[in-house]
């Protein structure tokens, strides 16, 4: 059986650097698809679907920082991928700043980003794999093991201030008992945010099979059942 390709797929390319747009378009062509470079200014978020319909777009590639070279777009690439996801268009994010942005501008939208590729390691093979993965997740609801969420309990370590945002630092033994992970306080529903205090336990849907911290997403937060919480604190020796 021949390996799957991007044949007949039209792939929109959001990238504020013209040379990178052309390079990505060339890689898409090598994968069997048709690259559609989005020239500046890029359409606004609420005009994306109109643009996709007009250009017959099937998939999307986005750089994360889209305003480093002028006023290409007033939003992050992560926002564009997430908006596309919500409307049934699969997309991938390409960035060299995945670790710097992981806990804030990436984590806010990570649930709706099927694949994230480091730009220094981008090549035809991993681009094709990521785009086909995005298509399968969005259109067929086929998630890779690393993208399947699981009900996960976590301990709040602290809440850090970062510019105008607050980052909740947690530890999840179901993922890595020695590595702390952060996410924006805004991900937690407003009525539950008061529980984001050091020592408290939270529960969320998390893709704990992800190998990299920047691939983790957090969704559907809840508080532990009071009886279960009391039992857990007794086991852990907490007051």
Q: What are the language-model segments listed below?
A:
Residues 2, 6-19, 24-28, 60:
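Conserved acidic segment of CheY-like receiver
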Residues 45-46, 59-85, 96:
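Conserved phosphotransfer microenvironments
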